[in-house]
Amino acid sequence: MPTPSTFVDQTKIEVQAGKGGDGMVAFRHEKFMPNGGPAGGDGGRGGSIIFVADNGLRTLMDFRYRRKFKAEPGENGRIKAQYGKAAKDLYLKVPVGTTVYDFFTGEEIGDLVENGQELVVAKGGRGGRGNIHFATSVNTAPEIAENGEPGEFRTLRLELKVLADVGLVGFPSVGKSTLLSVVTSAKPKIAAYQFTTLKPNLGMVLLPDGRDFSMADLPGLIKGASQGVGLGIQFLRHVERTKVILHMVSMDPNNGRDAYEDYETILHELASYTEDDLSSKREIIVASQMDIPGADEKLAQFKKDLAAHGVDQEVYELSSVTHQGVDRLMSRAADLVSEVEAQEAEAAVKPKEEVKTKTYKYHRPEKMEFTVEKLADHEFEIHGEQLERLVAMTNLDHQDGIMRLARRLKKMGVDDELRAQGAVDGDDVYIGDFSFEFVQ
């Protein structure tokens, strides 16, 4: 039996790009140069996280078991003005057809629609500058270097626009939903009346040999569907996107219908669909409900009628209740899916240079905005993404770095805003993980 598997069509993940390497504070100490200038190199760029569309993947199941991804940081700068090494980017494969959204805002970040297409979803932080960049005529030996910029952190929602590889078609109550529930872990509602399946139910079929494909139980058809009767048009649009059709015909002798007429009616509706002749799709004819007494006689007549009308195809016998014929049918479906995919891949070959990398760009406000919150008497906290990034990139191990940060905060108006909120000398001020005493 195929292994049941839940079909995952959307999931939530977290991505953390790598921090840039820290800039170095260093000085030249060479013979005959006792007063050598600054020689601290820059840190390397942190690794970005990049999605790559891969048409060999069908689901987002890999992201169900691992939801957090972190790229490596860049190397720190070195002495003698040597730059730190940039970190390698982290590439994550996703199925073609994956759309990426910001989990909290719902903003669409990108849509991966071509095999090999890349999307940068979290950009690595730039390396901090070493003290070779901060020498001036006034301060020829600066003890100032920047820490590496933090890598972008994002919470993402991945959504896969599922195109079922195999579509189950046939009149209502021929056993489509039952078959889907047997070969996958999908749990469609099943009942013996028309149009039980109001929308496609999706599942993944995993075969013992490692092959897999997605399968959809589509709404049952009736005569006139191609003209919009019942759920016909919606149904046919779903069929249009499948690779293989499993055409199920009931062998229940008590349903009062002729098996070949049912088969011919469905074929006619598929062929009459105005947007495409769906009857030309690869098809497997399935004689369902073979466990019902009298089904063998009805099957024999069905085969005679097919032959009389020039249909030279094998009919696969199936009982979803007893699982008779399920393994053989699923193996044949996987064979046809592979054949169709090979044909599509050959027809869709494109020069490699046509696939471009897209980068999601976060647009920071031009003005560095911040807010001051009074936590308690003599305690204040300053909020602001860019301000917190500035503090994170400041090397606070050296007095020159601390003084440079103080000057920048004053220039931005932080001191004035703290005074306006009632701050006095000695009050504690917090910016992210950094704290200091306010001085008028």
Swiss-Prot record:
Cofactor(s) annotated in UniProt: Mg(2+)
Chain sites annotated for binding GTP: 170-177, 195-199, 217-220, 288-291, 319-321
Listed Pfam families: DUF1967 (PF09269), GTP1_OBG (PF01018), MMR_HSR1 (PF01926)
UniProt cross-references to Gene3D superfamilies, sorted A to Z: GTP-binding protein OBG, C-terminal domain (3.30.300.350), GTP1/OBG domain (2.70.210.12), P-loop containing nucleotide triphosphate hydrolases (3.40.50.300)
GO annotation terms (biological process): ribosome biogenesis
InterPro entries in alphabetical order: G_OBG (IPR031167), GTP-bd (IPR006073), GTP-bd_Obg/CgtA (IPR014100), GTP-bd_prot_GTP1/OBG_C_sf (IPR036346), GTP1-OBG_CS (IPR006074), GTP1_OBG_dom (IPR006169), GTP1_OBG_dom_sf (IPR036726), OBG_GTPase (IPR045086)
Entry's Gene Ontology cellular component terms: cytoplasm
Entry keyword annotation includes Signal: no
Binding site for Mg(2+): 177, 197
Superkingdom classification of source: Bacteria
Domain OCT span(s) in chain numbering: 362-440
Single annotated GO MF: magnesium ion binding
Alphabetical keyword list: Cytoplasm, GTP-binding, Hydrolase, Magnesium, Metal-binding, Nucleotide-binding
The keyword Nuclease belongs to this UniProt entry's keyword annotation: no
Domain OBG-type G, chain residue ranges per copy: 164-338
Positions of the Obg domain: 5-163
Main location: cytoplasm
Record EC number: 3.6.5.-
Localisation: Cytoplasm
PANTHER family in the cross-refs: DEVELOPMENTALLY REGULATED GTP-BINDING PROTEIN-RELATED, MITOCHONDRIAL RIBOSOME-ASSOCIATED GTPASE 2
Function per UniProt: An essential GTPase which binds GTP, GDP and possibly (p)ppGpp with moderate affinity, with high nucleotide exchange rates and a fairly low GTP hydrolysis rate. Plays a role in control of the cell cycle, stress response, ribosome biogenesis and in those bacteria that undergo differentiation, in morphogenesis control.
Similarity annotation: Belongs to the TRAFAC class OBG-HflX-like GTPase superfamily. OBG GTPase family.
Subunit structure: Monomer.
Protein name, as recorded: GTPase Obg
Organism of derivation: Lactobacillus delbrueckii subsp. bulgaricus (strain ATCC BAA-365 / Lb-18)
Record gene name: obg
